[in-house]
From Swiss-Prot:
Signal peptide as annotated in the record: 1-21
Keyword terms: Acetylcholine receptor inhibiting toxin, Disulfide bond, Gamma-carboxyglutamic acid, Hydroxylation, Neurotoxin, Postsynaptic neurotoxin, Secreted, Signal, Toxin
Cystines in this chain: none
Protein name (record): Alpha-conotoxine-like Am1.5
4-carboxyglutamate modification, residue list: 49, 62
Domain of life: Eukaryota
Length: 65
């Protein structure tokens, strides 16, 4: 294998690694955002319980307004 071909293979590996890393990070952020929305919806359903409990009220002031 020539030096030019080895360099080309190296660049392809770096590019593939970067793309995979970028896509997995993006998927994690999207999944995390969806989980936060789901948690907020669940908390809003339990609003009376949470707002009357001091620790929950401090942790989630956005639902007790």
């Amino acid at each position: 294998m020539g030096m030019r071909m080895m360099f080309t293979v190296f660049l392809l590996v770096v590019l593939a690694t970067t793309v995979v890393s970028f896509m997995s990070g993006r998927a994690f952020r999207d999944r995390n955002a969806a989980a936060k929305v789901s948690d907020l919806i669940a908390l809003k359903a339990r609003r009376p319980e949470c707002c009357s409990h001091p620790a929950c009220n401090v942790d989630h002031p956005e639902i007790c307004r």
